[in-house]
Amino acid sequence: MKTRIISGAVLVVLLILTLGLGGYVTAGVLLCVSLVGYHELAVALGVQEKNKKLGLPQFIGLAAVVIHYFILMTTGANMAAFVAIIMGLFVAEAAVFVFKYPKFKSDQLVGAVFSFIYAPMMLSFIYLLRSFPTGQFLAWLPFVAWICDTFAYFSGVALGKHKLCPVLSPKKTIEGSIGGILGSVLFGVLFGYVYATYADPNMKLQTAIISFAVITLVSGILSQIGDLIASGIKRDHDIKDYGKLIPGHGGIMDRFDSVIFITPAIYFLALIFLK
């Protein structure tokens, strides 16, 4: 527990510096985190076999991560570029599958593309949130996933009776899930007050509170789906943790799975409510 608390505190300090400085610092840190996250997920899905050298499918995937962030930093929120990099990666992986057949399996092709979309691409929306005029505030919104997780845990311990997904995650309850969503909305209300007071004084307080309550409501629901997806992948491949990078927490995907999953939704909802 002590190790978990210490590493958690260090993680928070690094987040404050990363999101506070913005620009190339934020992009650089996200790139590094994305590379590790991609590697963890790719290994879990069998794109790269454990304890084996870096294979061509994963090398191409890692190269795509670097290219994606370069494009992101030079063009910003260019959705056409997002689609192009996904298609380019798919074609490259498909070519490897065809011309190296039967060295690589079709599962590795699918896993390489899925890992890229899930970890690096979805996580990169934090950079886009940080690029908003009020990005120093908005970039923190994805971490409502941790608020949701905390409220869900304590609500489940205190009130949990009905299982949410008994096969996939036996300890999760419907009561805990509802508590997590309510905790997320409470955070959204408080965030809305802070946002209207300090980030954008021109925004009406009521509008800010309602906007962020809706954003965090959706985030609270998606956060739990993201957590269950990550758990399902681990169960399917019989692994306990995605990695060991963060002592007491596991890997990047263990700590950021829900954060990653909700970030694109938060970005697009922010475009709608804060335009």
PLM region spans:
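Short, conserved aromatic-histidine micro-motifs
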Residues: 200-207, 249-251, 256, 275
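Interfacial loop-to-transmembrane junctions
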Residues: 235-258
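Hydrophobic, small-residue-rich transmembrane alpha-helices and their short perimembrane loops
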Residues: 222-223
